[in-house]
């Protein structure tokens, strides 16, 4: 890329940075005064004319200044040399806050609240997807001789409790055998494989009485737990930030709120996140959803080095602090993965 192209990108970078900070259209005189561009105001005006002709900036109404277009934001994000990381104190505060979560639900609630505060946007966290989870532990507890409590714990920290009503009473020895058989069938397996294993076990021990009946009833309840679609659950925080930024959205605020409530668009975008640590920025039309006009989403996956638990990110107007938002999303995702992976 030639020096003129590089110079024009520096002009674009300055326009994006100033517009994000001030919300005001940016003129050539302002750019020369605020930034060390090393050229005259006339040269900057010429560069802005080229950027406008190429679709990177536009003139709103009768203002003499210019604002970035979605194409301009895209170029700015694609050419971010580096994203300033959060300070050590900020990272430590995030880690301590998330580690204080008592269980999966609490950790995710803390994460979404924290991310909304850090970015001043709408924060979204997807519950761990079942397809990537492994059964870490199964507990079978007798509430009465004919009533059991099944507790399934996955490696992502998800805890599911189910009641099993037996057709007949079982004694302590039979309870121990039932716990052992179900544990051998489930523990250490991905949930998809575990559901097959428990169904096979029920088929092998099919019997109207004795332990076969207990296994069959337990299997029916466990299958409900193992195939339940928790990946369709989202946590959101900071929706009040939408109204604070209402003037920045190019489309209808109502349509954005409806899209968030329906969750379909958001789930589709989060489902595309398959690599922990990789942050994706979708600007305006790139969300491929009419309801999301004028919005950007910064998303990533969270999990361990070898397992993705789910997706997370923020939604806000295209006039967004992209470097700061990317850094915050990446940091919170990393610590969610560490906290859940250590449990």
Curated annotation (Swiss-Prot):
Pfam families: HrcA. Keywords: Repressor, Stress response, Transcription, Transcription regulation. GO terms for biological process: negative regulation of DNA-templated transcription. GO terms for molecular function: DNA binding. InterPro entries: GAF-like_dom_sf, HrcA, HrcA_C, WH-like_DNA-bd_sf, WH_DNA-bd_sf, WHTH_transcript_rep_HrcA_IDD. Gene3D superfamilies: 3.30.450.40, Heat-inducible transcription repressor hrca homolog, domain 3, Winged helix-like DNA-binding domain superfamily/Winged helix DNA-binding domain. SUPFAM superfamilies: GAF domain-like, Winged helix' DNA-binding domain. Transmembrane segments: none annotated. The keyword Nucleotide-binding does not apply. Negative regulator of class I heat shock genes (grpE-dnaK-dnaJ and groELS operons). Prevents heat-shock induction of these operons. HAMAP family: HrcA. Belongs to the HrcA family. This is Heat-inducible transcription repressor HrcA.
